[in-house]
Amino acid sequence: MGLVDRGWALPERNKTLPMYLKEQGYTTHLIGFQHEAINAYTLGYDTISKRRAEPLHNCHKLNRSYQKFFEIHQNDEKPFYLCMGVSQVHRPFGIWGDPVDPKIVLIPPYLPDNKIVREDLSQFYGAIQGVDTCIGKIIKQLEDFSLRENTLFIYTTDHGEAYPRAKCTLYDPGLKTLLLMSWPGSDILQQNKKFNQMISNIDLLPTLLDLIGAKIPKNVEGKSFLTLLKGESDTFRKEIYSEKSFHEYYDPLRCIRTDEFKFIINFEKSENLYQIGMDIQQDALGKFMLDYIKKTRPNEELYDLDNDPNEKDNLIDDPNYKEIGKELKDKLYKWMKLTADPILKGKIKDLRQESPIRF
């Protein structure tokens, strides 16, 4: 529903990936950032690095911690799970590395092309290059300690980039996340293999359990996409569902996405076409975009992704799309009922604390 440093928490009945892996004989470890719980030990980690790289977790400053970990665990009898959390592509971008030339940056179709946007993107791309360099060093460390061949390396993100119409929205730039998987010693993951099928974040946990031969509990909502990785299937999900309720503010959104269409419900009225996170608002780009998006937001949105991949033309009132809109809306409400979505009972209570906990 919302951020853990603003009053929200995972239900105690929920088991995490580290908990499941411990049951399979893995040791579990965390270095760097997490924001699933106030107390990271409740997530099932055996060890948690105390080293912090302020003001946010910087991959380069944590590099020594990674190297020490691999050195200690290179000859372990038990397999290990290590979560490495970094925030270098989180705002503010400028503190993480050298910006690229603003003249050569690629402008996403959902942003205007001007000096403010180009300068901001140049810092963002610089931060990405910094993380890319750091990941290269981590992979080199795995090789140096003879761990690379038998280690499944996963690089992923929790949401889209921190830009208006991306982060904190259910448009594709906010929903699409990075997922890279590499396992040189396995014949399951082929090098340079790309997949275009839709998957959801909740599918990663059952896939990892499936990869190690563990039984997937019936109460796990995600689906293993191991058959995709093995090339045994070309199809996976026909649709995915997404939601947002709180970030720094209450902004309840729900959506269903298929390969061809997307249907979004905005449960709260807004004078802005879409809301902007505080981290974006505080930068020059955000202040500019607040004026750029002054337009009343519709209650419902429907997009033909084949003909309008940038989600600019809302077809909710187009009679030619009335049938598909109703079909997607019915499916979305069915999913909301299945997941006991509290929005069905009205406005969700705000649990934000007056003094947010920092961790």
Predicted segments — roles?
Residues L305-N307:
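Extracellular, beta-strand-rich glycan-interacting domains
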Residues M1-K294, E300, P309-K337, I343-F359:
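Formylglycine-dependent sulfatase
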